[in-house]
Design a protein with these regions (language model features):
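N-terminal Rossmann NAD(P)H-binding glycine-rich loop of SDR-like oxidoreductase domains
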Residues: 4-22
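NAD(P)H-binding glycine-rich loop region in Rossmannoid oxidoreductase-like domains
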Residues: 36, 42-80, 87
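Conserved Rossmann-fold NAD(P)-dependent oxidoreductase catalytic core, especially the SDR/UDP-sugar
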Residues: 87-130
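Flexible, glycine-rich beta-alpha linker
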Residues: 111-112, 154-172
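Active-site Tyr-X1-5-Lys
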Residues: 128-154
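Substrate-positioning beta->alpha
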Residues: 166-172, 186-211, 215
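Mid/C-terminal beta-alpha module of Rossmann-like enzyme folds, strongest
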Residues: 207-267, 303-306
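Amphipathic terminal alpha-helices
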Residues: 282-306
Length: 306
């Protein structure tokens, strides 16, 4: 395995993938910042691969999942995640020899569900959010291109990706537990799938030899209770408090009320409450058939907690 193109090498997962493969392979990064080998804003331009030949593409670049507040933010999901993917492939099409394999970091958001237990790859993908829609469009485009050009396509549908210096919801939880502001709701019963970044990275050599769509999880699907208490234990035994579902509903209604009458977006509302209290887990048994053996986030906190 040699000559790898990586997009999104400055991102949370992309940077870790770049560092892992750059020690033993000729890796070429594509992105907007000046430290990339090929400098290109994929959302607006087609990259030029002059005298660069590669066997594998690992496409990590993308706009992360947030709740868009403006139409501009909605449009950015399509521009970065879908148009950016099309531009990348247009650039690849211009080289004399196409790569043998293409790995795309997608998301479980393509399923379009907020609640469910052990959802597998056969579940119909009907994304509802701009983020999920843009990822599904990118998936379809890549898969069709791969079939047309005899390139192995592997799509990773990932839940929350965790690791050192996390972003998003996990960072929010850790920061609030540190400050003593975190509260579990309804005893933190809801379970969510997640996956360690290091496990995804170490599995990529296997994925390069395969093709298809794979859910990747840690197989533990921790509850908010388990996760929050593990974090608290590792942060000087901080105490994690709990509020009842009844009280949480009252707070959520207040958030709804403020937005309805004053158009002020509150950090907690009924939609947020539903997501926090609903279990959402994914089945990774398809990946296990080709050698996926992840670490459990609950038993290996040293891999993602400082």
């Amino acid at each position: 395995m040699k000559n790898i193109i990586i997009t999104g090498a400055s991102g949370f997962l992309g940077a870790k993938i770049y560092n892992y493969f750059n020690s033993n392979n000729l890796v070429c990064s594509v992105g907007r910042s000046l430290n990339n080998n090929v400098i290109c804003d994929l959302s607006t331009n087609i990259p030029v691969f002059s005298n660069i030949f590669f066997d594998t593409v690992i496409h990590c670049a993308g706009k992360a999942h947030i709740v868009p507040r403006t139409q501009k933010e909605v449009n950015e999901f399509n521009e970065v995640n879908f148009v950016g993917t099309k531009n990348l492939i247009k650039g690849i099409d211009s080289i004399p020899k196409l790569p043998k394999s293409f790995i795309f970091i997608s998301s479980v958001a393509v399923y379009g569900v907020d609640e469910g237990i052990l959802i597998n790859e056969e579940h119909v993908a009907k994304p509802k959010t701009p983020y999920g829609i843009s990822k599904k469009l990118a998936e379809d485009y890549i898969i069709a291109w791969g079939k047309k050009n005899n390139v192995k396509i592997c799509v990773i549908r990932a839940p929350l990706i965790i690791g050192k210096d996390p972003l998003g919801n996990l960072k929010f939880m850790i920061d609030n537990i540190k400050s003593g502001r975190y509260l579990n709701i309804d005893k933190g019963r809801a379970r969510k799938s997640m996956v360690l970044a290091e496990d995804i990275i170490s599995f990529i050599p296997v994925l390069i030899k395969n093709e298809g769509i794979y859910n990747l999880t840690d197989g533990c699907h921790p509850s908010f209770f388990e996760l929050s208490h593990l974090i608290a234990k590792n942060i000087n035994n901080k105490t994690v408090h709990n509020i009842s579902i009844t009280f949480a509903k009252v707070l959520a209604k207040i958030g709804d009320f403020i937005y309805f009458f004053f158009k002020i977006e509150m950090p907690f509302n009924s939609l947020k409450l539903k997501k926090i209290t609903a279990s959402l887990t994914f089945d990774d048994s398809k990946a296990r058939k080709i050698g996926w053996k992840p670490n459990c986030s609950l038993s290996k906190p040293s891999l993602w907690l400082d």
